[in-house]
Amino acid sequence: NDCYYCGIRKSNSQVDRYRLTMDQILACADEGYVLGFRTFVLQGGEDGGFSDEAIADIVRCIKERYPDCAVTLSFGEHPYETYRLWRMAGADRYLLRHETADRVHYERLHPDSMSYDNRVRCLYDLKSLGYQVGSGFMVGSPYQTPVNLAEDLHFLAKLQPQMIGIGPYVPHKETPFAKMEQGTVRQTLVMISMLRLMFPKALIPSTTSLGTIAADGRERGFMHGANVVMPNLSPVSVRKKYELYDNKICTGEESAQCRGCLDRRAEAFGFQIVVDRGDYIS
């Protein structure tokens, strides 16, 4: 895709793109399992280099090797039958942010090749197939208004997702929005708080983007209602290549290998990190 806000958009020729092999992906899962993690997120672009069946095979392998673990996918927009194939292979969850619930705003953030209606169709297809569904939006994205944010809350109230991912918009120098203002910590924390009140049981991450624009952003996210942290299991050699926005943090503490660092930071704010499947409790 070629979303105008994304640092790894199709038109950015400066990106050092990569694919992980099946063996590399399974090695990451092996390492995560030893570290105590019981849920894995597989994320990538809408990449023709991976067939639908190839992704299904990866899901099957992880579920066969670690049947006590959850597998979450985030591979963008696909037909119903593709989502069904991956669900039958064992995928438990799917992350697909709606980004904005206002059609005109959506069209200002995306090229003509992308459709608001198709994005919404995907989310409802995923729900109908029994996935635990994650959606969400950027806070402070270009051209966003307070009315847009209210529409986002209304959209989520109708969708009733199990996971909600929001974070401040942070510009990337190789996008059409390079000179746009970034979102604010305060506005993001207000939206997290409102979502927690609306969705008492939802899985709401305190995102990397919050930690990027404020040193204590992630901790403040937890204080305002977030309850999920997502350590990075990607091979160290490729982590910096996944730069959705400028100055994305890629520190030791963001790494899955620094479990102790994460535990200590959480405990300092009165929290305890639980490493289980993290299923939504209905």
PLM segments and residue spans:
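Catalytic cores of alpha/beta
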Residues: 79-88, 142-156, 211-224
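Conserved, mostly hydrophobic/aromatic
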Residues: 3, 42, 96, 126, ...
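Core AdoMet radical
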Residues: 10-25, 32-53, 58-59, 63-123, ...
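Auxiliary Fe-S-binding modules of radical SAM enzymes
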Residues: 33, 157-282
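Generic structural signal for well-ordered alpha-helices
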Residues: 29, 56-60, 83, 120-123, ...
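Conserved mixed alpha/beta catalytic, RNA-binding, or beta-rich assembly cores of soluble enzyme
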Residues: 132, 147-148, 203
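Short, small-residue-enriched loops and turns at beta-alpha junctions
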Residues: 46-51, 112, 140-145, 177, ...
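Local cysteine-cluster metal-coordination motifs and their immediate loop/turn environment
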Residues: 1-10
